[in-house]
Amino acid sequence: MSKEKIVGNDFKIKFDGQQHQVDANVLVSSLIHTTTIVQEVNKYLNSGKKIEIKVKALEKGSFLCHIELVETTLDTLKNLLTKDNIEVGAAIVGTVVGLIELKKFLKGKKAKEVQQQGDKTKIVNKDGNVIIIENATFNIYEHSPVVKDALAQNFDALNNDPAITGFEITDKNEKALVRVDKSEFVDLSQKSEEVEEGERKLLRQQQ
């Protein structure tokens, strides 16, 4: 899991591929699903703010799409760049990254063990590996079918495009926050995880 502190209210989506271009339908699909996830995260975080998702630029590279989250007012739709709003944007970006990391970590299977530890959640996957994430990220992942569907549909679309070899979210300086390789797209395109051996363990929060 990325240990980088998310700063700012924008991020970049990077599509890897030898052609340095992306099919328009795949791009639009990915942006729609990303927007859905962002709005659901904002709702679950209960920020009380209306968030708009703006595409700032399509940049050269493997293929970069620069995304900015801005709070808007209903009457003017103006960007309100305050410290508080930028922090809300950073929290949303961090949660989106965490959701992708968690889905990647679980590899299409249910968690073997889940344990709350204060404001964090410890998760053990089928291979016995451990990840620790924010409670909010785990709760959204567990209880939002909208987010699960959007994540799955995004990676299903990417998996069906042979030209795309990887998907990455970076900060505005193009420092990687989370990366998913082509070989992992199939696992992430599953809408629900399978339970391999019985029910998973839900442990009480440590005191």
Regions found by a protein language model. Name each.
Residues 2-206:
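Charged, alpha-helical interface segments at or near domain boundaries
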